[in-house]
């Protein structure tokens, strides 16, 4: 970056407060031009990002907001939670660095611009790798009326893994069926339903060992946290949370080696989570995908997936989904 460009940028703290995150978007001095394609007023909103690495397409997400001529952002990386990031805008193009711990090498830089209503650009890592990325405005997922529910469908029969597949078959050995339960031992692949769903009610029972971590991903994109090890994490990253976005209220106790249940309803972006019969998230909006999402195609049906990339033993049983008709 040139000295002239550095002098044109003044970093400030955003004044908008996201109550569900307990964090503030970081902002930078914007180009004073307003109006028209590529101006600061063209960028605000939620964006579903797709990053094309040499081996696969990865999901990411950013929410951009404008306040008094300044642009701020909250970023979901390849994993992790929504984190403030400083947005620089110059000559109608944006640039931002990925915060530490979001699944990218520290110092990774996004550079992009608006083209045909989409964000397009490059991701450059500190080791010189360069990937293409694109962003589409996230759909509202608003529904016109209450859903009509179909018939319940068991997703796990208790005997084998029929109806499930793995994101990484080479790491599938951590999963197995024991005494009618689906068990994860340690860290490895995610396990994913072969069927995809849009709006649904999901019942799932789980038993989380000491110092263990997993999660239930709705449509493969929104994680409801399961854990007994996040002692230093914020409430919106603990047991019962929609990870990084919505904290359960009241808090869900971490009780290892005990069978517990979630009853989760997802309609559009509206989620309700009931833990052991008590509502802990009541019809709250999920702003966007959570870290580790299988893709960023929020308008499409998606699978149920159980997280396998964290430590510890977690068992599951009685996994039943009731799709909307």
Language model segments and positions:
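Boundary at the C-terminal end of the N-terminal hydrophobic targeting segment
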Residues: 22-30
């Amino acid at each position: 970056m040139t000295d002239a460009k550095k002098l044109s940028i003044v970093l400030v703290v955003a004044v908008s407060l996201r109550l569900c995150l307990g964090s503030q978007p970081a902002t930078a001095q914007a180009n004073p031009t307003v109006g028209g394609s590529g101006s600061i007023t063209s960028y605000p909103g939620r964006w579903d990002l797709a990053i094309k690495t040499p081996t696969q397409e990865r999901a990411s997400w950013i929410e951009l907001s404008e306040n008094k001529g300044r642009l701020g952002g909250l970023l979901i990386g390849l994993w992790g939670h929504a984190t403030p990031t400083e947005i620089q805008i110059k000559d109608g193009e944006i640039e931002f660095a990925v915060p530490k711990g979001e699944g990218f090498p520290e110092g990774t830089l996004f550079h992009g611009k608006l083209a045909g209503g989409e964000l397009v650009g490059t991701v450059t890592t500190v080791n010189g790798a360069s990937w293409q990325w694109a962003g589409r405005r996230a759909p509202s997922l608003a529904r016109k009326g209450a859903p009509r529910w179909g018939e319940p469908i068991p997703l796990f029969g208790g005997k084998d893994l029929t109806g499930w597949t793995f994101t990484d078959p080479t790491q599938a050995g951590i999963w197995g069926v024991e005494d009618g339960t689906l068990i994860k031992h340690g860290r490895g692949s995610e396990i994913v339903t072969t069927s995809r769903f849009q709006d649904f009610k999901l019942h799932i029972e789980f038993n989380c060992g000491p110092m263990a971590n997993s999660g239930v991903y709705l449509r493969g994109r929104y994680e409801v946290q399961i854990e007994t090890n996040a002692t230093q994490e914020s409430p919106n990253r603990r047991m019962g949370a929609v990870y990084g976005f919505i904290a359960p209220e009241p808090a869900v106790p971490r009780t290892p080696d005990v069978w517990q249940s979630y009853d989760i309803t997802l309609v559009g972006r509206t989620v309700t989570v009931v833990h052991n019969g008590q509502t802990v998230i009541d019809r709250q909006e999920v702003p966007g995908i959570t870290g580790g999402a299988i893709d960023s195609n929020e308008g499409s049906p998606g699978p149920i997936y159980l997280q396998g990339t964290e430590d510890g033993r977690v068992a599951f049983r009685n996994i039943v989904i009731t799709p909307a008709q």
